Amino acid sequence: MADGIDRRADDRMEFNTSKEVTVAPTFEDMHLKESLLRGIYAYGYESPSAVQSRAIVQICKGRDTIAQAQSGTGKTATFAISILQVIDTVVRESQALVLSPTRELATQIQSVIMALGDYMNVQCHACIGGTNIGEDIRKLDYGQHVVSGTPGRVADMIRRRHLRTRHIKMLVLDEADELLNRGFREQIYDVYRYLPPATQVVVVSATLPYDVLDMTTKFMTDPVRVLVKRDELTLEGIKQYFIAVEKEEWKFDTLCDLYDTLTITQAVIFCNTRRKVDWLTDKMREANFTVSSMHGEMPQKERDSIMQDFRQGNSRVLISTDVWARGIDVQQVSLVINYDLPTNRENYIHRIGRSGRFGRKGVAINFVTSDDVRILRDIELYYSTQIDEMPMNVADLLS
């Protein structure tokens, strides 16, 4: 646990994996660069997690790879280590490109790559919307070995010829299920069209719906697969409950009642729309509860500041849309409340994955109106899980 990965589930994970994949029990067995190994150990890793021990060697061999594993299993480091192994830092050109669905995730990936590559003199830039284009241009013109970004800004920088693609050898799609939803699909194709024909493609995600797997055939050649069977994906250590609220109007009072009974370390409350986030934030503040909020239409600086406050524990309760749900590491979060059930059932695992990350116990509570019962049952079926009615002693579950 010292290295931030929950390994207790590793032995029980079912890997629906290509036959040619072997397991590398140590990082030394992967034959990584000495400078990279130093960075890995300095970062706090001692031995590879289940997904790392299977996927890194395949990616470093140049194979197109689909890697699927739950939150908290070290997915980000899987491709970060692989990228750092294959790039040549002597060549000051972009050699690997990582696309993520949110700005926060792209920035976090950049910081992981910089930390793991601390002894390699690696240049990695976060190329994201909502930031100063001039800064992007300056950094890209200087030369970046790795670019971690969101599809829109990356496509724009390629079109403007500031992000040069001729040396790119690897494209990573992180949280591919979200990226390949309709909103990002065209932008990914825009980026892909500019890449050299032999570019290696790596797809990483906690959930890979069948239509996404089908779509990857369009830009992957004979990919190696490291897949956890879908029914294994509900996160261990997360207790999942629902509260029947009958009507939408009753949710607010239910939330206030919960605040009175729960002593919370940190909690995230998810709503489905920006408008609902703003409305609930105002209503909670009127009732003298201290909350912060975040959604995708806030200026980037404001989002960064809110994230930093929450990471440092200065704010304890964050109300957010799904912009926050994917891959953001805040280890103190012990409670997630789905004020609204997610409209996309695949987002459910990303939301509740916020609580109990890295083996910490967590509780997820779903507010369910009469109209939501069908959606809740659909989520239970999809993940082969059971979501029980919340018991009276819920405060004990968090202690």
Curated annotation (Swiss-Prot):
GO molecular function ontology, one term from the record: ATP binding
Domain of life: Eukaryota
Domain Helicase C-terminal positions: 237-398
SUPFAM superfamilies noted in UniProt: P-loop containing nucleoside triphosphate hydrolases (SSF52540)
Motif range (DEAD box): 174-177
Alphabetical GO biological process terms: rRNA processing
EC number: 3.6.4.13
Annotated compartments: Nucleus, Nucleolus
Q motif (motif): residue ranges: 25-53
Domain Helicase ATP-binding: 56-226
Enzymatic reactions: ATP + H2O = ADP + phosphate + H(+)
GO CC term, one of those recorded: nucleolar chromatin
Pfam families: DEAD, Helicase_C
InterPro entries found in the cross-reference section: DEAD/DEAH_box_helicase_dom, Helicase_ATP-bd, Helicase_C-like, P-loop_NTPase, RNA-helicase_DEAD-box_CS, RNA_helicase_DEAD_Q_motif
CDD domains, per the entry: DEADc_EIF4AIII_DDX48 (cd18045), SF2_C_DEAD (cd18787)
Keywords tagged on the record: ATP-binding, Helicase, Hydrolase, Nucleotide-binding, Nucleus, Ribosome biogenesis, RNA-binding, rRNA processing
Positions that bind ATP: A69, Q70, S71, G72, T73, G74, K75, T76
Family: Belongs to the DEAD box helicase family. DDX48/FAL1 subfamily.
PANTHER family, per the entry: ATP-DEPENDENT RNA HELICASE DBP3
Domain comment in the entry: The Q motif is unique to and characteristic of the DEAD box family of RNA helicases and controls ATP binding and hydrolysis.
Function: ATP-dependent RNA helicase involved in 40S ribosomal subunit biogenesis. Required for the processing and cleavage of 35S pre-rRNA at sites A0, A1, and A2, leading to mature 18S rRNA.
Record-given protein name: ATP-dependent RNA helicase fal1
Record gene name: fal1
